[in-house]
Amino acid sequence: PKTFGITSPISLAAAKDTDCTLMQKLIETLKPYGVFEEEEQLQHRILGKLNNLVKEWIREISELKHLPQSVIENVGGKIFTFGPYRLGVHTKGADIDALCVAPRHVDRSDFFSSFYDKLKQQEEVKDLRSVEEAFVPVIKLCFDGIEIDILFARLALQTIPEDLDLRDDSLLKNLDIRCIRSLNGCRVTDEILHLVPNIDSFRLTLRAIKLWAKRHNIYSNILGFLGGVSWAMLVARTCQLYPNAIASTLVHKFFLVFSKWEWPNPVLLKQPEECNLNLPVWDPRVNPSDRYHLMPIITPAYPQQNSTYNVSVSTRAVMIEEFKQGLAITDEILLGKAEWSKLFDAPNFFQKYKHYILLLASAPTEKQRLEWVGLVESKIRILVGSLEKNEFITLAHVNPRSFPAPSENMEKEEFRTMWVIGLVFKKMENSENLSVDLTYDIQSFTDTVDRQAINSKMFETEMKIAAMHVKRKQLHQLQPSHVSPKKKKHSFEGVKLLSLNDSSIDLSVDSDNSMSVPSPTNATRTSPLNSSGLSQGNSPAAPVSFSVTNVQATDVMVPQNNSTENLGGSLNESIPESATHPGFSSTPKPLVTRVVSSMRLVNQLQKPVSNTITKMPSPVAGVKRTSSPSNEDSPKKNKTEEDENDSSISADVDDQNKLETEELKEVHSEEKSSSPVPGSLPFSQQSSTDLSDISVVPATPIPVIKNSIKLRLNR
């Protein structure tokens, strides 16, 4: 039999009747969440139309460039799909990722001019726009109601045959870097499908895992969690280790494998291949920066890249804890003690932590807000990385979902978006008081955002960032009912957080269904924050028994600097490490200052100790999630014969898990001997090049307004 993956499988066991029953229950549980696409025929028809348009356009270009008639008749051209649609896990309302492949005589400029014009002439095409200067250039459109993103790649071929296999590495020869990036999505997707033993089982398992990740707020590559392709590769590796298992078993094995995975050992679906094309590939033996990646998941197509280079100490700790919780729940499901719905219950993020940082991005128009929010969000992981390096902070957990916030000044139109970061502070055994100054951490973040805004020439007047600290109980004072727990029937409307001189800051949040994660259609509709469990009555034990007595929060406005030269780089490019911790300029006066309670300055502004993190911490312990099984949940009762049977079954599951854990260690041993593994080095967040062609941003600081958050924590 064919072996999948770089190691032998853990188990070849086939599905039992109970597994099939559980799989049917899983399918029924998934249906209300809209994870199964209902418009497949429409999408197939639209892609067929698009494919015909591409062929027609390439023939026209060929005639304009006076190619021989014999070549024109067979010139070809083709639309390929990639991402969730190609993997077969496309969800309702999601867009389709497509790639236009053209022969060598068709230029990228042709794609963004004549093909763009051709699309504009189609009645079915709406909302047409091109982003030619993006890291991966793209044309976006809505075709007959279906959102489509089209990339472009020109191959060094005279014609494009219908049976072209993009996995052929020789196709990459003599291509520019933008074409290689554009091809990468299709090549990775196709490789994944060729490396799993059973595509149907893979697809159903991936649908379940993606829904679980979104519901548990750990689905976001840009914020340091995992994106779609990374989740697909983890599921594919699980399928390789259990080639005969069906989805109900694979979901459980997924949590078993990755709750016990020995990070930073990389996840590989196949042995990396050498192609001698001189392209940068992930290899910690050669590239020092690759040794610092915490959770490497390596794409199977050349040039191999780490799809999770954004993962930080905190995001990895959060994900590993979620893997462990997923294992505990699926153990219960296999024992018949829980239903699949429990796995997809959204955890209570807004009750989980005692301290939070709120980030607010605002702009004077909706169009500017969209651009500004995109930039700020792409850099939040830098703030998380800076916070987790603070010697007093154990964990910084950003909620991947942002929320709309109303304008602070009702007389002036303003569009605002808010993100929430949960903090766990270190417990100090020999100190009654703990003074924490987060000014430097916030300043580093705002410096980076400001630099990028000016470099990319997207900055507009009145674009602002605000950051402030709030305690868990203050979150409940926000205006909308979907932020406050529904314990009382009276409205919280009009309640605002108190600040200096009787001024106030209104952090109320409007509902925005477009921001919400999938939720069952037959359940009561809730707003985004509600779906995260904020309305649940029981709050878990606070991670830290500190209280905040002193808080300062300052709005930050990007300065207008018309004389600043273009320092290079684009909106979607990675920022070098040197740019994430810029030096400070002289302190200008803040535009607006707000202080909660009287302020006693503690800790002068200084850089945090650089070597506070010298090893990769284990997942945070002691934080009880709302869905965690607890001994307090059920009172003790006399043991019956049924209980003894349950205990026997439970012991069998535990024994099986332990046995497979030992086999998993053997898998790690095999992988260590056959793959490059990062060395044991001190943690230092590094930017991945990821086929990047960015220029280094100079370290000269751009003057910005200081954003000060200083806390006095009492035990």
Curated annotation (Swiss-Prot):
Its EC number is 2.7.7.19. It comes from Xenopus laevis. Monomer. Its main location: nucleus. Mg(2+) 1 binds at D95, D97. ATP binds at F82, G83, P84, T91, D95, I96, D97, D149, K210, Y219, G228, V229. The gene is papola-a. This is Poly(A) polymerase alpha-A. Residues 515-539, 560-588, 674-692 have a biased composition (Polar residues). The record marks F135, K140, N310, R381, D506 as: Interaction with RNA.
